[in-house]
């Protein structure tokens, strides 16, 4: 087998293990990597690396299926999804499966079907992973040249990149098909408190779609996380889908330009580092979406955002005191600010008190009460609907920032048993996983650059901590 990596970068290298138990192509002498280096041992055996990737995909799909069935088994119809620690059923509900007006879950059978389909798919992938890891050819170059590769073959690597982009593009278009042709998506902004609807007029104007990309990520602009209607969400997926497909075919049909050949490091570890930073970026973006956005992460399923919980507290007390006879338009609080209503920095009428810090909140339950200059006094006095009152009261007691003592209306007491908002789970998990992936990117990028420069020699195993451990054989 042709060796694609110079072994000089791995020596002086020693192994604490019995060399007699090594397997050619997978032991430290032939690969330069010890057993704990994982897929690094498979750098030059494309068939076995394929097996590892397929098996990994099987594990991910298995988790999706098993966890979906776990959530279905523990689902309690009388409680909202966000009060039950669920993170997968909210995603399926957002896609319009099994959900009715107001975000009410009316049928969990679609979730059961999704879970079972993922389990079946994971079994197929698992079989493929085991086959390619244990039975299939070590390398694909001889038996299946179309699937073989040389890490240094820049044209082949960009072709593989193109294939991935095409598949990702079709994945984005699947959401578009679901939104327009297969039952629609759940729209939290639908009149009356949200409903599933067909998105039959997606935004195709590039100025609108790419306008999000050009927005500042700081302050109130919110970059792409600021999307606030389903037409833009679906239109964005149309643009992303066709752009990825077009870019994919571009990379399949062309060879990398000279500047790209010079600028990038072309090795397996370099490609790993590029992939890690891409996943890291997506994780960071997802964490911000989960925390701030209540359009693609509807509060009916994920619980209120921090600003939503704060504003709903002020709104709930306004409704209560107005019924008791308070003049909500003129009452002052202890600080001299409006107790119920006040003016924003830009002159709009907003909810009063300490909630002014979140005065720019946009949420489906309060938007119907706005006029051209903020909240409309006439609507506040005459048009508040029961569903708005109920939703605000529910959100007030399920703040993602829950604390035992409310400070300035930022968060109220989390009036539930063991309640942790799915927004908190999803935001923190994606942020820290994204950070870990970013560190992995720096590690592998540094090693790849050093190897390309010719001075990366690997870890000196003379002083390796594992040498102090009992041999595994």
UniProtKB/Swiss-Prot annotation:
Domain of life per record: Eukaryota
Cited InterPro entries: PS_antenna-like, PS_II_antenna-like_sf, PSII_PsbC, PSII_PsbC_sf
Phosphothreonine modifications at: 15
Protein residues bound to [CaMn4O5] cluster: 367
Subcellular location: Plastid, Chloroplast thylakoid membrane
Gene Ontology BP term (one): photosynthetic electron transport in photosystem II
Keywords of the record: Acetylation, Chlorophyll, Chloroplast, Chromophore, Manganese, Membrane, Metal-binding, Phosphoprotein, Photosynthesis, Photosystem II, Plastid, Thylakoid, Transmembrane, Transmembrane helix
Residues modified as N-acetylthreonine: 15
Membrane-topology annotation of the record: Multi-pass membrane protein
Cofactor note (record): Binds multiple chlorophylls and provides some of the ligands for the Ca-4Mn-5O cluster of the oxygen-evolving complex. It may also provide a ligand for a Cl- that is required for oxygen evolution. PSII binds additional chlorophylls, carotenoids and specific lipids.
Propeptide position ranges: 1-14
Family to which the UniProt record says this protein belongs: Belongs to the PsbB/PsbC family. PsbC subfamily.
Its job: One of the components of the core complex of photosystem II (PSII). It binds chlorophyll and helps catalyze the primary light-induced photochemical processes of PSII. PSII is a light-driven water:plastoquinone oxidoreductase, using light energy to abstract electrons from H(2)O, generating O(2) and a proton gradient subsequently used for ATP formation.
Subunit organization: PSII is composed of 1 copy each of membrane proteins PsbA, PsbB, PsbC, PsbD, PsbE, PsbF, PsbH, PsbI, PsbJ, PsbK, PsbL, PsbM, PsbT, PsbX, PsbY, PsbZ, Psb30/Ycf12, at least 3 peripheral proteins of the oxygen-evolving complex and a large number of cofactors. It forms dimeric complexes.
Protein name: Photosystem II CP43 reaction center protein
Protein source organism: Guillardia theta (Cryptophyte)
